[in-house]
């Protein structure tokens, strides 16, 4: 997904990929995707490397990032997407190998700072290793920031209705740490834990200790929903909340936050480039201080 997204931008050039897959299989997986469809471009393999749209991309299969010799291909930024090297100590091996900066595609497991578009990008101070947090945090944080900035959040609970992920089982299987997580993904709605809401407190310090949440894993291949239920400091009608969200989507958070009033469903957002989309028709207010937002 990172690779496909990069192909849509003229200011990013992929020069190298490290994966334990061989180049032929890597090319196959790039060409064909059950969720996102065929790759819009040419893909071939030459001398053990990928050639995409005529550009050669170095392919390696190193288990230790310190051996990757990123300096040989002029790497500026590494997208660390294995889910394994999520601390400063382990991710710094990419710096040792010659990269200038590293972006972790999941939440860091130590004090490595997390930055989320629409929440705290303005706080970035040139750190060489950062985390982009989780997909759920990226969806929740812009929404929570708009609400907190305009009305104040006293406290809140989040539920994410989350699409199936690769870590789940196709049929029931052993899962010693998470028994429910071992049940068949296509057969069940599976309650699960998530640190996404608490992570919002790391990127928006004013919300630290005010949010927590849980997840339901559901049998859909892509697109997830965040349901945020909050108690507001400043009373607001649902129409006032909608206006604040629309103003942000068209103003300060344009390109990050979306606003929709159509009768949409999850597949309408397959391939969505915005971080978060507020569904104006899906939310509901109990009163002017207690609301559910989607």
UniProtKB/Swiss-Prot annotation:
Membrane keyword on record: no
Gene Ontology molecular functions: glyceraldehyde-3-phosphate dehydrogenase (NAD+) (phosphorylating) activity; NAD binding; NADP binding
EC number: 1.2.1.12
UniProt keyword terms in alphabetical order: Cytoplasm, Glycolysis, NAD, Nucleotide-binding, Oxidoreductase
UniProt pathway annotation: Carbohydrate degradation; glycolysis; pyruvate from D-glyceraldehyde 3-phosphate: step 1/5
Site label Activates thiol group during catalysis, positions: 162
Chain sites annotated for binding NAD(+): 19, 63, 105
EC category: oxidoreductase
Superkingdom, natural source: Bacteria
InterPro entries reported for this sequence: GlycerAld/Erythrose_P_DH, GlycerAld_3-P_DH_AS, GlycerAld_3-P_DH_cat, GlycerAld_3-P_DH_NAD(P)-bd, Glyceraldehyde-3-P_DH_1, NAD(P)-bd_dom_sf
Reaction equation(s) it catalyzes: D-glyceraldehyde 3-phosphate + phosphate + NAD(+) = (2R)-3-phospho-glyceroyl phosphate + NADH + H(+)
Primary location: cytoplasm
Span list, region Disordered: 169-188
NAD as UniProt keyword: yes
GO BP: any one term: glycolytic process
Protein family according to the UniProt entry: Belongs to the glyceraldehyde-3-phosphate dehydrogenase family.
Name under which the protein is recorded: Glyceraldehyde-3-phosphate dehydrogenase
Source species taxonomy: Bacteria, Pseudomonadati, Pseudomonadota, Gammaproteobacteria, Enterobacterales
């Amino acid at each position: 997904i990172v690779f496909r997204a990069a192909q849509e931008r003229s200011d990013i050039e992929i020069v190298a990929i490290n994966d334990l897959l061989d180049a032929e299989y890597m090319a196959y997986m790039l060409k064909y995707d059950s969720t996102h469809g065929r790759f819009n471009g040419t893909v071939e393999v030459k001398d053990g490397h990928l050639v995409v749209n005529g550009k050669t991309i170095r392919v390696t299969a190193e288990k230790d990032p310190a051996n990757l010799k990123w300096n040989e291909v002029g790497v500026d930024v590494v997208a660390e997407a294995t889910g394994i090297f999520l601390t400063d100590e382990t991710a710094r091996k990419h710096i040792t190998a010659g990269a200038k900066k590293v972006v972790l595609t999941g939440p860091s497991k130590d004090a490595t700072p997390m930055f989320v578009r629409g929440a705290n990008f303005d706080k970035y101070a040139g750190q060489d290793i950062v985390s982009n947090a989780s997909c759920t945090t990226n969806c929740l944080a812009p929404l929570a920031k708009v609400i907190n900035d305009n009305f104040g959040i006293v406290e809140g609970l989040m539920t994410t209705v989350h699409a199936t992920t690769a870590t789940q089982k196709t049929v029931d299987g052993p899962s010693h740490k998470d028994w429910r997580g071992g049940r068949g993904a296509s057969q069940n709605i599976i309650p699960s834990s998530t640190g996404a809401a608490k992570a919002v407190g790391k990127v928006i310090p004013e919300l630290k200790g005010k949010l927590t949440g849980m997840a339901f894993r559901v049998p859909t291949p892509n697109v997830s929903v965040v349901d945020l239920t909050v108690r507001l400091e400043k009373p607001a009608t649902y129409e006032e909340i909608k206006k604040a969200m629309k103003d942000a989507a068209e103003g300060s958070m344009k390109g990050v936050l979306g606003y929709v009033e159509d009768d949409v469903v999850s597949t309408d957002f397959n391939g969505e480039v915005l971080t978060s989309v507020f569904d104006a028709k899906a939310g509901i207010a109990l009163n002017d201080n207690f609301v559910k937002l989607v």
